[in-house]
Amino acid sequence: MAQHTVYFPDAFLTQMREAMPSTLSFDDFLAACQRPLRRSIRVNTLKTSVADFLQLTAPYGWTLTPIPWCEEGFWIERDSEDALPLGSTAEHLSGLFYIQEASSMLPVAALFADGNAPQRVMDVAAAPGSKTTQIAARMNNEGAILANEFSASRVKVLHANISRCGISNVALTHFDGRVFGAAVPEMFDAILLDAPCSGEGVVRKDPDALKNWSPESNQEIAATQRELIDSAFHALRPGGTLVYSTCTLNREENEAVCLWLKETYPDAVEFLPLGDLFPGANKALTEEGFLHVFPQIYDCEGFFVARLRKTQAIPVLPAPKYKVGNFPFSPVKDREAGQIRQAAASVGLNWDENLRLWQRDKELWLFPVGIEALIGKVRFSRLGIKLAETHNKGYRWQHEAVIALASPDNVNAFELTPQEAEEWYRGRDVYPQAAPVADDVLVTFQHQPIGLAKRIGSRLKNSYPRELVRDGKLFTGNA
């Protein structure tokens, strides 16, 4: 694999020499940092099984190497990367996999370790969505996830990835993560804080990541991280699990932040060792039981993961002073909900009791029941999935609902050819050789729902959202 030149400040190298365990070679660290990062993907088990995914992609000649800490994760090598980006493959467009760095799969593995099965989870810094979608898959779209993102520009990307992966149990918020301890005290069974950090572990992906690095900036970032972990710990219920992670390597932003929390709440914080998380985890284990992953250990990004348990309640913070405002939705009455459910089922859309119908004007939404306790406590950017818009002739079913709820075995499902599916993703109407009989057609490809079409004569009218339409070469070049 080709080398690339990484910029290392002298003070950073000094710091790394001091931080690195004696069992590791500093020369190996430098060599690993100069190697480009291995690409990796995670199979979306909400859409397919790992076995079915491997069978589907076998003709492409991809080399998939299992990632030890994530059963559905693989390092991927493929000859056609220049000809066809992974993001343009049919399997990616339909949400069968997520392009995710291997080490970033570690925090969610830690969150669900030892049979942990939380029902209400918060992802404090969620964009672009790799960990939120991984959490949703582990929860099998049950329960509820609050996915927060402080950066307004990244909320849209977060929603797009959640929608592509067919996720229905997520509520999105746009807050500074430091508000949650006061706003929603002891409301979550599990919390992931993948904290903003100095990014020292990402130099294999971005050789210039350390151009603005300084020891002073590490200290400033660590101060923010302490405030974030304190807030998250307040939002965690007693007995709940908190996973703290970063993609940086210095102790100040990693071990020291967790030790500060334990010093602050000595009777309420328990460190849960991660040495048995996967075979070989002990190679990165710290004396506290955390995983401090230097890039040469597993040939991945540098990363840090700690798992904590809240053993008892702590004093509640003063209530926040902001006003949430009136909630613009109201629950749909049972009789009407039954009619809506019946109409949705006729086009292949079905949902279980984890989701409840709500209405705003002519919009119909499905909210995860587990998030209802937070209504009135935080302001949501987006909640659940938009099911439909009502009009005089019935319902206009929404694309994100089709991706999340549709069964490909529905009587009105219509399987496209690869060429027809490409036309669909380009936003063009499709002219199949043998047109379907139904007027409302559930369009599928590779037996996966990819949209809903109106049949007009021999034409399938495209309803693929304009913002998702793709240009350039697509997947007929996969094989």
Swiss-Prot record:
GO terms for molecular function: RNA binding; rRNA (cytosine-C5-)-methyltransferase activity. Keywords: Cytoplasm, Methyltransferase, RNA-binding, rRNA processing, S-adenosyl-L-methionine, Transferase. InterPro entries: Methyltr_RsmF_N, MeTrfase_RsmB-F_NOP2_cat, MeTrfase_RsmB-F_NOP2_dom, Nol1_Nop2_Fmu_2, Nop2p, RCMT, rRNA_ssu_MeTfrase_F, RsmB/NOL1/NOP2-like_CS. S-adenosyl-L-methionine binds at A125, A126, A127, P128, G129, S130, K131, E149, D176, D194. It is an enzyme of class 2 (transferase). It catalyses: cytidine(1407) in 16S rRNA + S-adenosyl-L-methionine = 5-methylcytidine(1407) in 16S rRNA + S-adenosyl-L-homocysteine + H(+). Its EC number is 2.1.1.178. GO terms for biological process: rRNA base methylation. The keyword Amino-acid biosynthesis does not apply. One of its GO terms (cellular component) is cytoplasm. The keyword Ligase does not apply. It is found in: Cytoplasm. The active site is at C247. Belongs to the class I-like SAM-binding methyltransferase superfamily. RsmB/NOP family. NCBIfam families: nop2p, PRK11933.1. Specifically methylates the cytosine at position 1407 (m5C1407) of 16S rRNA. This is Ribosomal RNA small subunit methyltransferase F. The gene is rsmF.
